[in-house]
Amino acid sequence: MPAYAAQYWRQEEKKYVLPDQIIEAIDSCETEAHTKKHLKQFFMTVGLQDLSEMDYPLREAYREYLTFHLHLKNITPHLRAYDRIKQAYIREQMTTLSGRQKCQWRLEEKVLFIPYHSDQKLAMEFDTVRHKANMVWDFTQPAPWHLKEQIFTTLNAILQESCRALKRSEHLTGLQNLYRFCVQNDIADIETIDAAQEQAFIHYLDSDIASDTKSQQRLMTALNICRKTVFLQNPEINWNANVWYVERLNLPKHRLNPSSSVTTISFKEISMPENRAYAKEYMKYQVGITGQAFGTIFTRYGLIQRFLIWLSEQEQNVCACTQQQIESYLDKIQEDGISDKFFNSHIAGLKNFFWFMVAHGHMKRIPFQPEFYQRKEIPQHHDRSVSPAVCEEVLGKLHLLPEHLRCMYLHLWCLGLRISEVCTLKGNAYYRQNQ
């Protein structure tokens, strides 16, 4: 931190002559004469020696100087002049290699101010909102460096977003609240936040920040953005994260269903750390080794996850699970009125998971006999046929629908494709007559 940080702006003014570089920068600024005069007086008071010493803490000191020493009511033009001088200095430095290294936007133990970003074209996008709190990022707070890296990585991703300015501002505010929450609650890693901590964050927003549900949801989006950004930008896949993003798992196309809306695998709902760790190990094996279709793996995991959540609520380690506990769980899911086929899917999922636990040495044997609990499935036929009269009526009014809906209906009616398959068709899959 520069020497001026230890000085107080009310100290007795010393006889100090500003360097020519600083005087020229102030004189070249397009502002009122009295504004330039106040800047020179303040810089002389703090003994500014180089424009590189201009940063956000000094800007705040200048704000206090204007407010409490000069008793000015409208300080906006004066702060704008300060910012313009700093921004002009950054633009000049970015023309040289040494200057780019000096002004590079990087994570340091200091306060970062977005209008002083090394990419001044990007910084000027926030020029009209530079007075807002979400422009200031204090990385001097007592928090683990790893957490600061995650916040800084997400901050850069949000700054590069191409969305509307209002939405980007909401993301910045949400990320700032998340950073503050993590510091206050000693959270060292965004990727290990579980469901309980997520609820605590919602309560934090409810009690201190956001007054309505929609505001909470908008600010909560920052947590998902941070999780996704960090997970995708990690040099290697972080298998210890509580939320995995499918696009980072590098799965071949033949294992993915293009029509599936599944984008994440979540472990945060499993409250017991040991059970959560076993679930991650199981899914890492399924995704990385088995070669099965991802949809099959994810569906099975949903059944296993439900069981592990129930066990964790009982504060029971899955390795010490007994047959009586499994029977209690099966009785519980039967109360939901599930079909015999779905019940057998639960049995098959538990069997698959316990075989994995035995094969990897976490258990000596499977704690129940799956075949004993399986039910007889009676196939059912669902008549989904459409009468010819209805088909003719739809075809007669088809011209009233938009082109994409007409194409979808004709595919379903003529070709027999599934709805999910039709939804995956793209524009370049069609041949247009005479084109």
Residue locations for each model-derived region?
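DNA breakage-rejoining catalytic core of tyrosine-based enzymes
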Residues: K364, K376-E393
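Short, basic/aromatic-rich helical patch in the C-terminal catalytic core of site-specific tyrosine
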Residues: V422
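Short, flexible/disordered secondary-structure transition segments
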Residues: D340, G361-R365, L405
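Basic, Lys/Arg- and aromatic-enriched nucleic-acid-binding interface segment
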Residues: A389-I419
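Long, charged, glycine-rich C-terminal linkers/tails
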Residues: T322-I326, I366-R375
